Amino acid sequence: CALPIGEIISRPYINLTLQLMNDFGAKAKWLNEYQLKVEPQPYQSIPFYVESDWSAASYWYQIAALSNKAEIILPGLFETSYQGDSKVAEIFQLLGIESIYGNKMVTLKKTDKIAERLDYDFINQPDLAQTFVVTCALMNIPFRFSGLQSLKIKETDRITALIKEMGKLGYILHEIDDRILSWEGERCEMTADAAIDTYEDHRMAMAFAPVCVVMPEIRINNPQVVSKSYPYYWEDLKKAGFIIEEI
């Protein structure tokens, strides 16, 4: 049969599903780059530890990277993870954050080894793109991020949203071919008393909240959108010492 033409976006999520299916007794595997085979097989009940969410952890890596000093412990995360977004630890190492793994936890520590620029293909980790766009710009690290074509059809058009909201903070981003976002250090005047719009997108709210680490404050509209994936995000920020007020 004819195989489809095109790219598979977020392949690690498919691999995560296959791995969990196999863990619970199914027989599922890739036949080739585009085809899967799943055999008739009942699932089996087994003890299973549910790992914490690496996508949510990315915002704490972001906070550590933007801080002058930081040591943050994140429970429930494994060095060997099925989650594609566990790649966040490797990428943030380029931004000066070391990941030290312990018993079902990871500790984030600052280092002075920071890349002068960051170019990365997010085809397999598109949900991390907003985190790194905001972080790199605020750290004054030029970047070129590719593999972002799925961002146009997420909860919102995330590429357009990032360009607009980063513009409010004084950063001029450029979109190339609907799949690349770049920043080469261009700045513009900040919007006075700017409030970040979230576009009903949980990741817009969580990626922009850490801006307050380097700016006096940040206002975020419709903060309740975080409930989709991290309902206790604001409460956890308060526990870490952030002052959050509803206006």
Predicted regions and their residues:
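Short, structured segments at the rim of ligand-binding sites
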Residues: 1-247
